[in-house]
Design a protein with these regions (language model features):
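Short, intrinsically disordered, mixed-charge
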Residues: 59-62, 66, 124-128, 143, ...
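Glycine/proline-enriched, intrinsically flexible loops and inter-domain linkers
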Residues: 70-171
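Structured core elements
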Residues: 38-42, 49-55, 59, 104-106, ...
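Conserved mixed alpha/beta core segments that line enzyme active sites in large multi-domain catalysts
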Residues: 24, 121, 138-207, 212
């Protein structure tokens, strides 16, 4: 099965190859697998700075520099991105003690679909299941820089505003897994003009999630 080979999540049974598959062809060549190395790093609680790819790379850079080992790195280009003309979604933080920093950006004209193979492969290498390009890239960035992101369907943000506040007592909220949960006034929630959309830093809501029909998104980055 795909999951047993580490190339997918399907566990329905033995993989059936296409009729044109030539007997004797190496599975690596037929499946287009790349030769790579995965490092499994055991972190102690005091080294949370290493709980990301960039965190590990930063430590390796220091190690190499002390030993005069040349290291090359490249910063990603951000050319081609420009500020749009549309109206932005304002953010109001009503619980700064629980959310000292909250920022967001609206991105329009996205197309939700399968991720490219390179992204799927990198997520599966670290034990994560690819879902779609929007969810996958946020998970990829989480593991790359150690900071979580969350995406809302911008069209589902009632009142075109985002409010960060404490929940009202005994508030009923349905999370992405379809389970109704009861919140307390100790819970921090991300809301639209009327209702909660997300339990901050914990679980997204069923009514604000990205679907195949999503075209505009609101991307959240916060410190809770």
């Amino acid at each position: 099965a795909e999951d047993e080979l580490g190339i997918g999540t399907d566990h329905q049974g033995i993989m059936v190859l296409e009729p044109e598959a030539v007997v004797g062809t190496a599975a690596k060549d037929y499946l287009g697998l790349k030769t790579d190395t995965i490092f499994e790093i055991g972190l102690t609680p005091n080294r949370i700075d290493g709980a990301s790819h960039i965190g590990v790379a930063r430590d390796l850079y220091a190690y190499c520099k002390l030993r005069n080992i040349p290291v090359e790195f490249a910063l990603p280009s951000v050319e081609g991105f420009s500020k749009g003309e549309g109206e932005s979604i304002p953010v109001r933080v009503e619980a700064p003690d629980l959310a000292p920093r909250y920022i967001g950006i609206t991105i329009k004209g996205v197309e939700v679909g399968p991720s490219p193979d390179w992204l799927k492969e990198r997520l599966m290498m670290i034990g994560q299941r690819p879902i779609n390009n929007i969810v996958d890239i946020t998970n990829f960035l989480l593991n790359e820089n150690g900071h979580p992101l969350h995406v809302f369907d911008a069209a589902k943000i009632e009142g075109r505003k985002v409010v960060v506040r404490r929940s009202t007592p005994n508030c009923k909220f349905v999370t992405l897994d379809g389970v109704e949960r009861t919140l307390s006034s100790e819970d921090l929630v991300i809301c639209n003009a009327r209702n909660p959309m997300c339990i901050a830093g914990v679980f997204g809501g069923e009514d604000s999630g990205v679907t195949e029909s999503t075209t505009d998104i609101f991307l959240e980055s916060a410190y809770f």
